[in-house]
Amino acid sequence: MTQSTRILLGVNIDHVATLRQARGTRYPDPVKAALDAEEAGADGITVHLREDRRHIQERDVLLLKDVLQTRMNFEMGVTEEMLAFAERIRPAHICLVPETRQELTTEGGLDVAGQEARIRSAVERLAKIGCEVSLFIDADERQIAASKRVGAPAIELHTGRYADAQTPTEVAEELQRVADGVAFGLAQGLIVNAGHGLHYHNVEAVAAIKGINELNIGHALVAHALFVGFKAAVAEMKALIVAAAR
């Protein structure tokens, strides 16, 4: 995993699968969405195989691994089931995330500092099979430093607090928290990605932060695609972040 010279867009297709699973049909196909996203300029495709299988299924992951022209960023919880699955399919990129059954979406970052031995073991186990691991964490120096200690080459900073901020003061504070996290991560020698809750009206400020390698965005893209189509939604987002990062 190397730092890109330009900002990258990772497209999360989980919620295409959410729509499919709502009726238990074969459509819409997240694999087709992934291929359309690639054609529209996505630099990678992100999928989260959750313990409860609420959206992405094993079959989706296997198909994507075979057909993607870019790369798959496989999000997973730190469980024996997921580690064994990863060892079987060997995705090039894995992002370890926290996970609870009751949450609507990932609610916070992984507590690396509070479980260093467990996370280090997972990172080492995945590295042995050639997987490059990132850790989804809050923009907190303690968690960033712990991520470095456990051997992860990359982190993804949770931008949910920024996305949820209501007042201009709160927005500015949370944006600065992300910017400080990026700077600290880079100083630790880590590749720094970011994502969660980003959409067409708040993404530019984050994309403008110097040093961010990649933004992972999903729900907003799928929602916008209902009105403009998936390729157009991805192309619009890609144009926004590239322009903001200049």
UniProtKB/Swiss-Prot annotation:
Molecular function terms from GO: pyridoxine 5'-phosphate synthase activity
Catalytic residues identified in the record: H48 (proton acceptor), E75 (proton acceptor), H196 (proton donor)
This enzyme's EC code(s): 2.6.99.2
GO terms under cellular component: cytosol
Annotated residues for binding of 3-amino-2-oxopropyl phosphate: N12, R23, G197, G218, H219
Pathway assigned to this chain's UniProt record: Cofactor biosynthesis; pyridoxine 5'-phosphate biosynthesis; pyridoxine 5'-phosphate from D-erythrose 4-phosphate: step 5/5
Localization, UniProt: Cytoplasm
Keywords: Cytoplasm, Pyridoxine biosynthesis, Transferase
CDD domains xref list: PNPsynthase
GO biological process: pyridoxine biosynthetic process
Catalytic activity: 3-amino-2-oxopropyl phosphate + 1-deoxy-D-xylulose 5-phosphate = pyridoxine 5'-phosphate + phosphate + 2 H2O + H(+)
Site entry: Transition state stabilizer: E156
Family: Belongs to the PNP synthase family.
PANTHER family tied to this protein: PYRIDOXINE 5'-PHOSPHATE SYNTHASE
Function: Catalyzes the complicated ring closure reaction between the two acyclic compounds 1-deoxy-D-xylulose-5-phosphate (DXP) and 3-amino-2-oxopropyl phosphate (1-amino-acetone-3-phosphate or AAP) to form pyridoxine 5'-phosphate (PNP) and inorganic phosphate.
Protein name as it appears in the record: Pyridoxine 5'-phosphate synthase
